[in-house]
C-alpha cells in the first residue's frame, strides 16, 4: 500500500486485528521511507452497489459518503464512535445483502433515518430536515410529533388540563434546585 505521507510504494504491516464489531480488519502500518504510521481498515464487500439518484443518475455506492452524512448529523453530539461505526456497517451490510445490485438514494436515506432515530433524536431531526428538504417550521413540528414528545409551547387539550397537578402554595414557595436563573436587563 502506498504511504499517504510521502507516497512511498511499500508499507509494512506492524499490527493486524479485527475491529470491535468484527466487521473489518484494522491494520497498523509504517512506511520504511519516511517512518510515517497510519491505520487502514479492510472490509468485506459483498457486491458492487450502484446508487440510483433522484435525478436518474447512477453512481457507485460510497461508504465514506454515508459515514460523512451521518457524522454531519451527529456533529457536536456525544455519541460513541463505535455505535456510529456499527450503524454505518449495518446499513452497508443490509444494502449489500439485499439481493439488488442497484439501490435508490431514498432507500439509503430511509435506512439512515431509521438508524439515527434509535441512536440520537437530534441527529435524526437534523438528517431528516436535509433529506426531506424541510421548508417551514410545520415540517419540523410534524417530524417531532412522530418522536412522541410534547413540543415546547404546545397547548394542552381541555381534557389534559384536568390531569395536570396544580402547585400548592408550599410547593410554589419552596426554593428551586439547580442553577439560579439569570435575569436579563
Curated annotation (Swiss-Prot):
The keyword Plastid does not apply. Residues 12-24 have a biased composition (Basic and acidic residues). GO terms for biological process: negative regulation of DNA-templated transcription. One of its GO terms (molecular function) is DNA binding. It comes from the Bacteria. Disulfide bonds: none annotated. Residues 1-24, 161-185 are annotated as: Disordered. Keywords: ATP-binding, DNA-binding, Metal-binding, Nucleotide-binding, Repressor, Transcription, Transcription regulation, Zinc, Zinc-finger. A zinc finger (unnamed) spans 3-34. Residues 164-175 have a biased composition (Low complexity). Residues 176-185 have a biased composition (Basic residues). The keyword Metal-binding applies. Binds 1 zinc ion. Residues 49-139 form the ATP-cone domain. Negatively regulates transcription of bacterial ribonucleotide reductase nrd genes and operons by binding to NrdR-boxes. This is Transcriptional repressor NrdR. It comes from Methylorubrum populi (strain ATCC BAA-705 / NCIMB 13946 / BJ001).
Amino acid at each position: 500500500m502506498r504511504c499517504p505521507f510521502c507516497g512511498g510504494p511499500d508499507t509494512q504491516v506492524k499490527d493486524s486485528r479485527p475491529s470491535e464489531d468484527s466487521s473489518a480488519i484494522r491494520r497498523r502500518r509504517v512506511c520504511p521511507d519516511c517512518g510515517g504510521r497510519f491505520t487502514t481498515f479492510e472490509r468485506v464487500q459483498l457486491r458492487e452497489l450502484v446508487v440510483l439518484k433522484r435525478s436518474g443518475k447512477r453512481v457507485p455506492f460510497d461508504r465514506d459518503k454515508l459515514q460523512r452524512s451521518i457524522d454531519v448529523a451527529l456533529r457536536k453530539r456525544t455519541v460513541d464512535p463505535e455505535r456510529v461505526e456499527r450503524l454505518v456497517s449495518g446499513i452497508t451490510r443490509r444494502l449489500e445483502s439485499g439481493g439488488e445490485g442497484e439501490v435508490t438514494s431514498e432507500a439509503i436515506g430511509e435506512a439512515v433515518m431509521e438508524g439515527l432515530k434509535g441512536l440520537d433524536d437530534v441527529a435524526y431531526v437534523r438528517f431528516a430536515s436535509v433529506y426531506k428538504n424541510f421548508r417551514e417550521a410545520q415540517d419540523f413540528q410534524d417530524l417531532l410529533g412522530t418522536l412522541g414528545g410534547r413540543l415546547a409551547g404546545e397547548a394542552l387539550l381541555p381534557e389534559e388540563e384536568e390531569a395536570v397537578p396544580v402547585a400548592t402554595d408550599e410547593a410554589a414557595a419552596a426554593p428551586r434546585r439547580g442553577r439560579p436563573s439569570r435575569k436579563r436587563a
